[in-house]
UniProtKB/Swiss-Prot annotation:
Required for meiotic recombination events; not required for mitosis. The gene is REC114. Its main location: nucleus. Belongs to the REC114 family. It holds the Pfam family Meiotic_rec114. This is Meiotic recombination protein REC114. One of its GO terms (cellular component) is chromosome. GO terms for biological process: reciprocal meiotic recombination.
């Protein structure tokens, strides 16, 4: 094995997704995507080698740290036009080749970036000597897109004003302008073209009308952005300009009074309300002057005050309606809860109520011996009734518990009442 050429590489790039190519290079393929490239250039030593084997084959290798093979291609010498192709533009060499390792034909790509022009020329000459196809990268697409972009930019700048002969020299120079490295980002090329335009177009006469000049921000050449394509052509750059969202306009809607209030009020009541509102305004106005003889009023801005008072009356009426509705709802809820509690309490305290009623009836049936005794008995009865009412109102509703059931079972009057109820129910069922 003979080492024909060996060069240190500055950067190695590989396309991660191989493309199916059943017809080889003549098959229809999708253009490579920029996001699918992997790069290797930092904290490592990369080397590209061209080796000649004794069997008459050529081996192309990309070696990492003198140990691992990133690329290892073996081809027959002289008859390799249908299996591998190279395209170059200093200092980059791109390679695409057909591989059949896993069955179907697959197209793979990789690129190497060299540190200087001498190494670049060495590899190109050695590949051509070994009868490899080495093409120069086409720059027509990048140049045409660049000229179109710069012409659109100059047309938008011109507007309605005239240019001098410097613009003509700029057009001629734009055709002849070429960059050394065509793999660099299109935005950098565009930035250099704009700088030339500003230097050449120095004598431009502006009209009287003030044209709005927009300021464009271009990326700095220090940005590490790279674009790859099949023939080392730079794709057209597209710039998206974010649009600021419009501020939202929020309008507050005034609450209109309900229709029920309008239907309830009669025309006479409306007139009375208006009269009261006007009289209130007249009293509150400091500049009001009353003449007793003619009964005339000299008040400034009286219609404006009337409108404001009517609005206030409507708003207050609507607020009162809302508050009355809220209070009525709360009262209904409270009454419902009270009724439920009273039903439960009535079931538990029927015996107590019967006992209290019997005691009150006995006290009412006491004969009166005289006027003083009668008054005293009446006062005591009234006081006892008041105290009983207070107790019933203060006592919280009792809950059915084991303790309460035990107390009721010990109560003789309650048990007698239960026995009476059982007798009555048994008689009703017998009938």
């Amino acid at each position: 094995m003979y080492e024909y050429c060996s060069v240190i590489i500055k950067k190695y790039s590989r396309y991660t997704i191989p493309s199916l190519a059943p017809k080889g290079f003549s098959s229809v393929l999708e253009p490579p995507h920029i996001d699918k490239w992997q790069h290797l250039s930092v904290n490592c030593t990369l080397q590209f080698k061209v080796l000649l084997e004794d069997s008459g084959q050529v081996a192309l290798q990309v070696i990492l740290n003198n140990s691992t093979f990133l690329e290892h291609i073996r081809l027959p010498l002289g008859s390799n036009h249908d299996s591998i192709q190279f395209s170059c533009k200093c200092p980059i060499i791109s390679c695409k080749y057909i591989s059949e390792e896993f069955g179907p034909k697959v197209l793979k790509r990789f690129q190497i970036n060299l540190s200087n022009e001498m190494d670049f020329n060495r590899i190109v000459i050695s590949l051509k000597n070994l009868s490899f196809i080495v093409k120069t990268a086409k720059t027509s697409i990048a140049r045409n897109t660049m000229i179109n972009q710069t012409s659109d930019f100059s047309n938008s700048k011109k507007g309605n004003f005239n240019e001098n002969n410097n613009a003509g020299t700029y057009r001629n120079s734009s055709v002849q302008f070429q960059t050394q490295n065509m793999v660099m980002d299109f935005s950098q090329i565009y930035q250099e073209k704009c700088a030339r335009e500003l230097n050449n177009c120095s004598n431009i006469t502006f009209p009287m009308t003030n044209l709005p000049m927009t300021q464009q921000n271009f990326p700095t050449p220090e940005a590490n952005v790279e674009h790859f394509s099949q023939d080392l052509n730079t794709p057209s750059a597209t710039q998206t300009i974010p649009i600021a969202p419009e501020p939202l306009s929020v309008k507050l809607l005034e609450a209109s009074p309900p229709l029920s209030n309008k239907s309830r009020h009669s025309p006479t009541t409306k007139k009375e309300n208006r009269n009261t509102a006007i009289s209130f305004d007249l009293l509150s106005k400091k500049g009001a002057i009353l003449h007793n003889g003619n009964d005339t009023l000299n008040v400034a801005d009286l219609p404006k005050k009337r409108q404001s008072t009517e609005d206030l009356v409507q708003i207050r009426s609507s607020a009162n309606v809302v508050t009355t509705l809220g209070t009525s709802c709360n009262l209904v809820k409270k009454n419902a809860t009270k009724q439920n509690k009273e039903k439960v309490d009535n079931k538990l305290s029927d015996s107590q109520n019967v006992a209290h009623t019997n005691e009150y009836q006995k006290k009412k049936e006491i004969p009166l011996c005289g006027p003083i005794n009668g008054l005293e008995t009446k006062m005591t009865l009234i006081q006892e009734e008041m105290m009983a009412a207070k107790k019933t109102s203060r006592d919280p509703p009792r809950k059915i518990s084991k303790r309460l059931i035990k107390e009721k079972l010990k109560d003789e009057e309650f048990m007698k009442w239960v026995n009476k109820v059982e007798r009555v129910l048994s008689k009703m069922f017998e009938k």
